[in-house]
UniProtKB/Swiss-Prot annotation:
Organism in which the protein naturally occurs: Paramecium tetraurelia
GO molecular function, one term: 4 iron, 4 sulfur cluster binding
Cofactor(s) named in the record: [4Fe-4S] cluster
Keywords: 4Fe-4S, Electron transport, Iron, Iron-sulfur, Metal-binding, Mitochondrion, NAD, Oxidoreductase, Respiratory chain, Translocase, Transport
GO cellular component, as recorded: mitochondrion
Protein name according to UniProt: NADH-ubiquinone oxidoreductase 20 kDa subunit
Length: 156
């Protein structure tokens, strides 16, 4: 009996991208109404855990920041600090109209006109507030985008 040595045809890049796209650990950063929908997305009906999405309370354990709600000028430095404390590789998902562009409070002097003015954003979930299904879809799209991006780059 002769064993062939080519039974493992998986590159290191594919292995790393597969592991990363299946284990998002988002930081809970809820600021307004969208935070309620983010909490709603964690119940058993949607079951984020089966996709490896486990919410974390500290930025050092997270690799995804979900900005859910209105970002005010006073909250902007805290958001930037949390982004800087999150370990690389990290991704940002902006959830809701207020986080995307100011939303209903766009013309207020105290509101940042989108969290992309403070930190780089990888995925946007529109609507006010987006449903749990929309957040679920956004996370799945981010996982697909991550798989494509890592396959294009060479890790080793």
């Amino acid at each position: 009996m002769i064993l062939k040595a080519d039974f493992l045809k998986l590159s290191a890049n594919n292995l790393i991208s597969w592991a990363r796209q299946g284990s998002f650990w988002p930081l809970t950063f809820g600021l307004a109404c969208c935070a309620l929908e983010m909490m709603h997305a964690t119940v058993s009906r949607y079951d984020f855990d089966r996709f490896g999405v486990i919410f974390r309370a500290t930025p050092r354990q997270a690799d995804l920041i979900i900005v859910a709600g209105t970002v005010t000028n006073k909250m902007a430095p805290a958001l930037r600090r949390l982004y800087d404390q999150t370990a690389d590789p990290k991704w940002v998902l902006s959830m809701g109209s207020c986080a995307n562009g100011g939303g209903y409070y766009h013309y207020s002097y105290a509101v940042v006109k989108g969290c992309d003015k403070i930190i780089p954003v990888d995925m946007l979930c529109p609507r006010c507030p987006p449903t749990a299904e929309a957040l679920f879809f956004g996370v799945l799209q981010l996982q697909k985008t991550l798989m494509k991006t890592i396959n294009e780059k060479k890790v080793f």
